[in-house]
Amino acid sequence: MAKLSAETPHIHDGCQITQSEFGAFVEIGAGSRVAHTVFGDYSYCDRGCDIANARIGKFSNIASAVRIGATDHPLTTASLHHFLYRSASYWDDAEDDASWFTARAARHAFIGHDTWIGHGALIKPEVTIGHGAVVASGSVVTKDVAPYTIVGGNTASLIRRRFPDAVAEAMTELAWWDWDHARLRSVLPDFRSLSAEAFLEKYA
């Protein structure tokens, strides 16, 4: 029997889930924290991830200890400390700064379809990772990543393109990530055995 379900996400022990939505066949690794985030179909994260204010496409592969939507502290005020906006934790007569949390929640990170985010990578708010892109382990990503590219480092920069531009564009046009579950199963042998170019020749 298949481990994953179209109806219910597979959420492992010790996770903290806050106001998040999950598509079909989603898996959340043990001890992960997911807040104000949408996970597309077939996407997963491994253990110990911290994901906030993110929009994650389909078939995203997120390794352990990844942080997406890492939150900021105020840089222009007299103090950086979160007593400025988590004030109710420090004084009985002070309220938290709701406007700060609203502004922070609006700064989404976007992760495209069929992406791979390597172990321990950090992706800042308002960054878009294009379809088919790879973020190397330990990278700090502060700028958008083009589709079907591989980036790495602190701060992340281009390592190489996965495919020639024409192939990358054709893969995006094919949008196989929108195929239904039955079709994906029928095409599984070709996903396993064909190069991207041969796959496009057969299905594009």
Which residue stretches match the model-derived regions?
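Flexible, glycine/small-residue-enriched loop-and-beta-strand segment within the central core
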Residues: 4-13, 18-127
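C-terminal segments of enzyme domains that contribute to small-molecule binding surfaces
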Residues: 12, 81-123, 155-204
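Alpha/beta-hydrolase-fold catalytic nucleophile elbow
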Residues: 63, 136, 152
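Conserved catalytic-core motifs of eukaryotic protein kinase domains, centered on the activation segment
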Residues: 72-74, 145, 161-163
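Short-chain dehydrogenase/reductase
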Residues: 116, 134, 150-151
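Catalytic-loop Lys-Pro-X-Asn motif of eukaryotic-like protein kinases
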Residues: 119, 137, 147
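Acidic, glycine-centered active-site loop in nucleotide-sugar glycosyltransferases
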Residues: 147, 152-155
